[in-house]
């Protein structure tokens, strides 16, 4: 029995041909069907050149297991989340490799209610069945049906439920879809703005879906992927820039000067927006950078709740706490009314509304927060002995620390600064985040000390 290395901690990702092909996709579909025994599943795929063939092989596997398949076509991951909870079906699968290299593809799996299927919630079971490849013969009388459907209008209806269009004042927004799956959704949102008479102008960059990615793999988390958005904001004198990754489950924002705004500060903005409409609500945040979020949420009368990093953990904690919103510094934003799932479209709509309501630019909205809690940004270090390196750091600071937290890796808090150090769930690296209370030189000095200790 050959091990399928495309099964990762949270999803499926692999090199095409070697780790993921049509046969493996069929086996995954068959395994999903045999394990969960769903009646109906929704499928979608991103813009990658292999997504359609892998999706159809996946559909065949599901149908062979007796599952009815509803194919929503080219889509972002969140459209599969939406379709799953909106239609009330038994699960969904998006074929996507998000921001991975060209020669990769993958899948994200959910069950009923768009609940994630990850390592300890069924993904290992699906893997075991797919690896064994020992399925009962196909019963043609019980074979599932295949149907193509279009849910985009219903999805856009849902998105517009988060804002009041009457609050929008004249806005010029640059939107960079990175030739990914976001383009058609941006077109649908633009049409809806026009139909509602909203004074919003969208300047669309790389809006045409193209699996060859002529302008590079869209991953605005990388500084080298930000120039086109920044330059368009400056050239057009836009109020804000928005950029997406390939399956648009992450949304990256640029201010009116084309400056990239770290996701950490957007969490605070969105928390504030929700608390204005829902006083006293709970807000989930991750432990990597937290002081700004805790400060904003507390001042606005909400309750901040810390969760381990990662979509499966955040979603689970949000359900447990009945939190209205959860945010990670990695530009993943989760919404209770979106079945506790992450969306890349809801955040920029909310921020656009907030800019209008506050009558301030995005830069003005975040400037004070960035000054109050300056952060290093996430710094990745490849280390031969990561556990020993983390222990070395802990021993060095143990006497000085006012508090130590192990929700995710190790967080150590001091009077005027704090840091979080954790190993990656997906890569052989250690990730460091440092922040201070309004003291940039202190934050930078402590960051240098930590990096020196890690690399000794």
Swiss-Prot record:
Catalytic residues (UniProt): 98 (phosphoserine intermediate)
Cofactor(s) recorded in Swiss-Prot or TrEMBL: Mg(2+)
Keywords: Capsule biogenesis/degradation, Isomerase, Lipopolysaccharide biosynthesis, Magnesium, Metal-binding, Phosphoprotein
This protein's pathway: Nucleotide-sugar biosynthesis; GDP-alpha-D-mannose biosynthesis; alpha-D-mannose 1-phosphate from D-fructose 6-phosphate: step 2/2
Origin superkingdom: Bacteria
SS bond partners: none
Cofactor notes: Binds 1 Mg(2+) ion per subunit.
UniProt-listed GO biological process terms: GDP-mannose biosynthetic process; lipopolysaccharide biosynthetic process
Transmembrane intervals: none
Pfam families recorded: PGM_PMM_I, PGM_PMM_II, PGM_PMM_III, PGM_PMM_IV
CDD domains per UniProt: PMM_PGM (cd03089)
Catalytic activity: alpha-D-mannose 1-phosphate = D-mannose 6-phosphate
GO MF term (any one): magnesium ion binding
Enzyme kind, highest EC tier: isomerase
EC number: 5.4.2.8
Amino-acid positions noted as binding Mg(2+) in the UniProt annotation, renumbered to this chain: 98, 245, 247, 249
Family affiliation: Belongs to the phosphohexose mutase family.
Entry function: Involved in the biosynthesis of the capsular polysaccharide colanic acid.
Name of the protein: Phosphomannomutase
Source organism (scientific name): Escherichia coli (strain K12)
